[in-house]
Curated annotation (Swiss-Prot):
GO terms for molecular function: O-phospho-L-serine:2-oxoglutarate aminotransferase activity; pyridoxal phosphate binding. One of its GO terms (cellular component) is cytoplasm. It comes from the Bacteria. SUPFAM superfamilies: PLP-dependent transferases. Catalyzes the reversible conversion of 3-phosphohydroxypyruvate to phosphoserine and of 3-hydroxy-2-oxo-4-phosphonooxybutanoate to phosphohydroxythreonine. HAMAP family: SerC_aminotrans_5. Binds 1 pyridoxal phosphate per subunit. Pyridoxal 5'-phosphate binds at A80, R81, W106, T157, D176, Q199, N241, T242. Coiled coil: none annotated. Keywords: Amino-acid biosynthesis, Aminotransferase, Cytoplasm, Pyridoxal phosphate, Pyridoxine biosynthesis, Serine biosynthesis, Transferase. This is Phosphoserine aminotransferase. It comes from Vibrio cholerae serotype O1 (strain ATCC 39315 / El Tor Inaba N16961).
Length: 364
C-alpha cells in the first residue's frame, strides 16, 4: 500500500526494524567494504578482515551484557527453533528429564521439540490475576528434582507476556531471550544458557546467539549434529561451517549502535518510556484493551484489541496510510500487536498513540 507520509514506523514482530543508522552504514559500505573493493558478503569467513568483524562483534556483545569470562558466546545458525533441539541434546547428559515453564506460545513450541529427546516436565505458570492474564512468581514454579535444567521464555511475543524474575534453583536455567535480549539489563551469571534469534534486537534473520556456561559444554549427546554442538562451535569459534557472514556483520553494527546509545541501561530507559506511553493510553481508553496484567506486560510486544473487532481491517489500512506498518496481531490471538524493539524510537510510539486517539474519536 502506498503511504501518505515519508516517515514509516515498522512495528513488525520479526524480522523487525533495524536502526536507521545501521542500515545507512551498511548501504554505504555495501559494494566497497573496508576499502577492499568488495562487499563484506563476498570475503572468506576465515579471512583476517572477517575474523576482525567476528571478534569485534563478540567483544561488543560481551561488553553490552557484561558476560563473564566463563561463558562462551556462539554465533549459530538455524534460529531459535534449532536451539529448541540443541538445548536438550547439549545439556541432558545422563539425565532423562527437563523442566519447562509454560507461559505462552513459544515456551510450548520449545516443549514440543524437547519431547523428542527427553521426558519434559511442564509447569503451567499462567494464572488469572484481577481479571487479566499473569504469570506465577518464579519462586512458586515447580521444578522436578531430577531435571537436568529448567527452561523458560522470558518474553512471549505473541501473548505479550514478560517474566521479570528467576527461580532460585541449583539447576541450570535456560532462557529463550529471542525477543528480549539487549532490551533490559540482566545478570548473565544467573543463567546456564541464554539463546536468542537475531531478528528482533540483534540483527537480521539468519543468525542466533547462544551464551553458554563453560561447565555445560561436556554433556552433549553422541547423536547431536556437529552444527548444533556447543563444544564444537566454541572450539571452532562459531566457524565449524560457513556462517551467515552478512548477518554477523550487521549484528556487529547493531552492537556498535547500541553502545553509542549508552548501552543496555540507557536503551532500557527508552524502552520503559515507550511501553508506558502505549500501555498508558490503552488503559485510559474504553475503545482499546490489553489482556495482560501490568506485572507481566511485555516491554517489547504490545498486543491490543479494538472494542469493535469488525473495524480491525479499517484500523490497519488507515494506520498503514499514516506510515504505521505491521500492526496486525498474530493469527493465534488476532487483534493488533505493536512490537517496539530497541530500534523503534519514542517518536514512533507517539505517532501510533496519536493515530489511535484519532481513530477512537472517529469510530468509537
Amino acid at each position: 500500500m502506498e503511504h501518505n507520509t515519508d516517515t514509516v514506523y515498522n512495528f513488525s514482530a520479526g524480522p523487525a526494524a533495524l536502526p536507521k543508522a545501521v542500515m545507512l552504514q551498511a548501504q554505504a559500505e555495501f559494494v566497497n567494504w573496508n576499502h577492499l573493493g568488495t562487499s563484506v558478503m563476498e570475503i572468506s569467513h576465515r579471512s583476517q578482515p572477517f575474523i576482525q568483524v567476528a571478534e569485534h562483534a563478540e567483544r561488543d556483545l560481551r561488553d553490552l551484557l557484561n558476560i563473564p569470562d566463563n561463558y562462551k558466546v556462539l554465533f549459530c545458525q538455524g534460529g531459535a527453533r534449532a536451539q529448541f533441539a540443541a538445548v536438550p541434546l547439549n545439556l541432558l547428559g545422563d539425565a532423562e528429564t527437563a523442566t519447562y515453564i509454560d507461559a505462552g506460545y513459544w515456551a510450548m513450541s520449545a516443549v514440543k521439540e524437547a519431547k523428542k529427546y527427553c521426558t519434559v516436565d511442564v509447569f503451567d505458570a499462567k494464572i488469572e490475576k484481577e481479571g487479566k492474564i499473569a504469570v506465577l512468581p518464579a519462586s512458586e514454579w515447580r521444578i522436578a528434582n531430577n531435571a537436568a535444567y529448567v527452561h523458560f521464555c522470558p518474553n512471549e511475543t505473541i501473548d505479550g507476556i514478560e517474566i521479570n524474575d528467576l527461580p532460585v534453583t541449583d539447576k541450570p536455567i535456560v532462557a529463550d531471550m529471542s525477543s528480549t535480549i539487549l532490551s533490559r539489563e540482566i545478570d548473565v551469571s544467573k543463567y546456564g544458557v541464554i539463546y536468542a534469534g537475531a531478528q528482533k534486537n540483534i540483527g537480521p534473520a539468519g543468525i542466533c546467539i547462544a551464551i553458554v556456561r563453560d561447565d555445560l559444554l561436556d554433556l552433549a549427546s553422541d547423536l547431536l549434529p556437529g552444527v548444533l554442538n556447543y563444544k564444537i562451535l566454541a572450539e571452532q569459534e562459531s566457524m565449524f561451517n560457513t556462517p551467515p557472514t552478512f548477518a554477523w556483520y550487521l549484528s556487529g553494527l547493531v552492537f556498535q549502535w547500541l553502545k553509542a546509545q549508552g548501552g543496555v541501561k540507557a536503551i532500557e530507559e527508552v524502552n520503559r518510556a515507550k511501553a508506558a506511553l502505549l500501555y498508558g493510553y490503552i488503559d485510559s481508553s474504553d475503545f482499546y484493551r490489553n489482556e495482560i496484567h501490568p506485572d507481566n506486560r511485555s516491554l517489547m510486544n504490545v498486543p491490543f484489541q479494538l472494542a469493535k473487532p469488525e473495524l480491525d481491517d479499517t484500523f490497519l489500512e488507515l494506520a498503514e496510510a499514516r506510515g504505521l506498518v505491521s500492526l496486525k496481531g498474530h493469527r493465534v490471538v488476532g487483534g493488533m500487536r505493536a512490537s517496539i524493539y530497541n530500534a523503534m524510537p519514542l517518536e514512533g510510539v507517539q505517532a501510533l498513540v496519536d493515530f489511535m486517539k484519532e481513530f477512537e474519536a472517529q469510530y468509537a
